[in-house]
Amino acid sequence: MPKDEVLIAMERKRYHERLLQTGTLAINANGVATNADKDSVISVMIAKGIAEQLMAETNERVAGQTAGASFEMLTMEFVKRTFPQLQHLRPGNWEVLKLGNRSRTKTSTFAQYEHLAYLTELTKANRKLSAMIGNDYMVAPDIVVYRNLCSDEEINATEPIVNDTVCRYADLREKNGGKAILHASVSAKWTMRSDLSLIHI
């Protein structure tokens, strides 16, 4: 099978095409790519090189927040179109969601981080505690992949595995009233700033 016919290669190509089609990635009349930090020579050079490699057309720069939101949406689409195809490796009822500042879903919505909501309330009520630990513990990813909980019917689908006498604290079991389980979080930063590490898909 040719290397460009495998799922990840095809979806990566589509992802790059969508960056161009939506104008998220473009080069303006001054030769500055939309994901460049215009005040950083290195950022401008790297961003332009990437844009040219992906054959970006010359367009005026879109607003930073608009480009950032578009990048997050396109990145979420890429994850949605690829991760579920790994069901045979990671079985489960998965959700891929783009979070935003206005989203009702926060990191504390998930089982592993539900204690953060409690910690936030404590620091609001106690100035000394707030000064001591600050708010650096808050995790704010742009995109999350999480697993929904399983009903007892799903768990017992092939044979009786659980009942009311066992697994009463298992996070995966819906009957226990827990929260969804966070599997992955993605930070999608559009602008190539010199103080941020760079990763590419």
Regions found by a protein language model. Name each.
Residues 1-102:
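Nuclease-adjacent, charged terminal/linker segments that flank catalytic cores
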Residues 55-162:
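Acidic-basic catalytic patches of nuclease active cores, encompassing PD-(D/E)XK
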Residues 57-63, 134, 170-184:
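Intrinsically disordered, low-complexity acidic Ser/Thr-rich regulatory segments
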Residues 143, 182-188:
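Conserved catalytic cores of phosphodiester-cleaving nucleases, focusing on short active-site segments
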Residues 150-152, 189-195:
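Short acidic, S/G/P-rich loop/turn micro-motifs used as interaction or catalytic elements
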Residues 160-174:
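Active-site glycine-rich loop that binds ribose-phosphate moieties when present
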Residues 199-201:
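Conserved small/polar residues in nucleotide/adenosyl-binding loops
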